[in-house]
Amino acid sequence: MKTMALMKKTAMPLLLALLAGTAQAEVHLSEVFGEHMVLQRDRPLNVWGRATPGQTLTVELAGRQARVRVGADGRWRAQLAALPAGGPHRLRVSGDQVVELDDVLIGDVWLLGGQSNMEFTLANTDTGPQEVASPQNSQLRQLRVPLRASVRPEAEIAPAPWVVAEPGRVGDFSAIGYHFARQMQAVQGVPIGLIDAAWGGSMLETWVRRDVALQDPDLAPAVRALPSDVEALTAALRQRVHDRVAAWQPGLPLEGVDASRWSAAADIDNDWPTLQAPQLWEDQGLAELDGVVWLRKRVQLSAAQAAGAAELQLAKVDDCDEVWVNGRRVGGQCGYDKSRHYSLPAGLLRAGANWIAVRVTDTGGGGGIYGDAAALRLDTAAGAVSLAGAWRARVEKVDVSSQPSANAAPTLAHNGLIAPLHGLSVRGVLWYQGETNAGRAAAYADGFKRLIQDWRGQFGDPDMPFLFVQLASYLPLASNQPGSGGWAELRASQAAALALPHTGMATAIDVGDADDIHPRNKRTLGQRLAALALHELGLRAAPASGPRLLAHEARGSEFRLRFGATAGGLRTARAGEPLRGFYLAGADHRWVPAEARFEGDAVVLRSAAVTAPVAARYAWVDNPSEANIVGGDGLPLAPLRTDDWPLESAGRRYQP
């Protein structure tokens, strides 16, 4: 809490006069500063805020002092000489009023960016219960930047506290940030401050600055079209979504509809369009739609299948569902990451036609039935009946929040969360994002590099470490298509950023979950990011990025990959298992699985189906969890390819 004390005056009239003029004689620190905060060590410290124009302010911290005059616009900014790690200290700003912040530490500050896997809280991880109950770590603090989309760069973040890592509160910390910080502290022994600015479901394009977006011909039109305020943006978004829904379900009104019979056991939906399930509706023509959508399916059952009780498996639903079978409500729940299972009593199903109706409410981000197709089924006494495929669907209601989502347009998240941090010194950035961009993966490579370079400019450090997580394994193994897939291509675009200096990539293909886009193991990723940071800072000699491809060549019917930076040689993740995850292609560009063997620091590939291989790939599928090559230190080999053939996503660009 910012505490404010008026300067003592010896004469009561002067004190009363001062009190009367308090509204005109204010001193404020920026909202990014607060008690329990951590400021960056060994760097000049910028402190800023607002005050009555013309005042002279004195800023003091741990023996450092600066004087500054408030500008005509009421803003002030002071710079203090660098401080070593330590504290707690008191920050004091004095003018016509005094503002003091206690329990200020000096250490390393790391900015956390990206989407929900970076946002994912410690309490929800596989080790959450133990971590949340651990003793207080007074040297670790977090500032969770409130989510706010803005059409113009904001001067302030929305008010939010710095929080000490203590039981009862640490569960809300970014799990990756927490495990990263613990590992860094074990080596460095200094305070760590985390600034969590991640936003679940956010696209890359929302995190770029306006000037950068204007340089991209795909983004520039949307940025130029941004209205002057959030209210106008919300109105435009509402109209855009309504127009999209009207085009998707032509002839079916949206306003004032009576949905009371949409759960009926009858063919009431013959004029409804269809959605594929399991699959989010944003990928099927209903982008940006939050609200209520009904999905209905007519299922034919035999007498044997209809006999007795049954179990309805609905994979997962984002976010809430209500379910009817043959007109009877059988259940409902909320939680985008929860599997849906509903028991159907004997007598509810019938031989012949049966109707399943699901009313889905999406409160933000993706919406619909999603997950593994095998988990969308009806388990009957006579076996399972698949429910995957086309469902009749109709939009009942569109909800447009008064606060637009991060993805309503490019630059919005940057304006609301990153722009207000301008001037703050940070040690580096941790980034986990890309799932939302998998549909236009090829374009991500250039956009990601532009973002890294621009953020370095904004924080005044051209060498600022930028460490990121490569997408984890996800989606059913059965859906893998060798040599293709949006997630596979997005990983390649992420890896392209390693061409920039002072970047590092933590591979996550071995810690994913086929059924959950949010793998619960965040400790491994935090520790891998810490290893990258320690190597970047010169505190770890060995590379922290797994084996690295040095050379490749075709030799007759075989293809040879030679590796370096293996930190103890190549091996499989578990001793004795065959090498998996490699693919070969000939001049026809057809990818087939390859047999593989180790030869020293090389892997030699062959396939009876490819007599003259010209290219190889490894872990190049959406879910490469079966790929099993690691270095001697256990760090996985990242997905790779030796070809430069066009990606499937080439040409797919951002569209409003």
Regions from the PLM with identified roles:
Residues 65, 560, 565-656:
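C-terminal beta-sandwich/jelly-roll accessory domains of carbohydrate-active enzymes
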Residues 41-43, 286-290, 311, 524, ...:
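Surface beta-strand/loop "capping" patches
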Residues 25-53, 102-112, 119, 276-289, ...:
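Non-catalytic, glycine-rich low-complexity segments
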Residues 86-96, 357-358, 614-620:
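Short, aromatic- and glycine-rich surface loops/edge beta-strands on solvent-exposed regions
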